[in-house]
């Protein structure tokens, strides 16, 4: 079974999820990535687009992005099979841009949002065959997720903004099963993740905080 290191960094030494200073980082061993870097913009600052382009020129690809108490937090890695990557960073949801990129063979590989901007990352040569996107309150999302799970789609990106959850589900052979969890405390979500790892769910996908609850998706992988 894949070994993992779960690193929890709480800047105000608080275990309460409602504390906006909590930053949770998941580090995983034995992946296909052989080099990784990360950087953050600083609270209230714009995305460091120049930095992204510099690392693109060194064959790094964005593999994770989140908006945190430290501003935009970007991780980029080598060793991914993707061949091209693009992103949209703007105040409105980039529907037309996503449509055009899909026609060119791109799929959404990372997604996040701040109060003022969306950040959508799309890549070519992914393991996704098709994608569905839904933006709705969580009460609606639950049924929508079940519907697409039944059609062999899996959650691959998720973000929450102003009470609305945006979920991307992808048709892929990478996963065999998937679940998600909520907790109001850091310790609570740590315990739930460990239980799922013991059950064979060996990859945690995405953390998101909304209404003082921490969300995490986890799946079994091939």
Task: Say what each PLM segment does.
Residues 20-222:
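Terminus-proximal functional modules
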Residues 13-21:
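Bacterial Sec-dependent signal peptides at the C-terminal "C-region" and cleavage site
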Residues 4-14:
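Sec-dependent N-terminal signal peptides
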């Amino acid at each position: 079974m894949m070994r993992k290191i779960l690193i929890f960094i709480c800047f105000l030494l608080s275990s309460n999820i409602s504390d906006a200073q909590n930053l949770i980082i998941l580090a995983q061993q034995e992946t296909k990535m052989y080099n990784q870097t990360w950087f953050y913009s600083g609270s209230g600052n714009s995305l460091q687009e120049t930095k992204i382009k510099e690392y693109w020129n060194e064959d790094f690809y964005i593999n994770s992005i989140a908006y945190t108490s430290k501003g935009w937090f970007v991780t980029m890695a080598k060793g991914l099979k993707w061949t091209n990557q693009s992103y949209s960073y703007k105040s409105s949801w980039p529907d037309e841009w996503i449509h055009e990129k899909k026609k060119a063979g791109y799929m959404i590989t990372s997604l996040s949002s701040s109060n003022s901007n969306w950040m959508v990352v799309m890549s070519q040569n992914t393991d996704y065959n098709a994608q569905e996107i839904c933006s709705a309150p969580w009460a609606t999302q639950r049924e929508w997720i079940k519907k697409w799970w039944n059609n062999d789609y899996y959650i691959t990106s998720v973000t929450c903004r102003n009470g609305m959850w945006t979920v991307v589900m992808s048709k892929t052979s990478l996963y065999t099963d998937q679940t998600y969890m909520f907790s109001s405390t850091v310790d609570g979500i740590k315990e739930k993740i460990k239980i799922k790892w013991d059950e064979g769910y060996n990859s945690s996908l995405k953390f998101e905080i909304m209404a003082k609850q921490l969300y995490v998706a986890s799946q079994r992988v091939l």
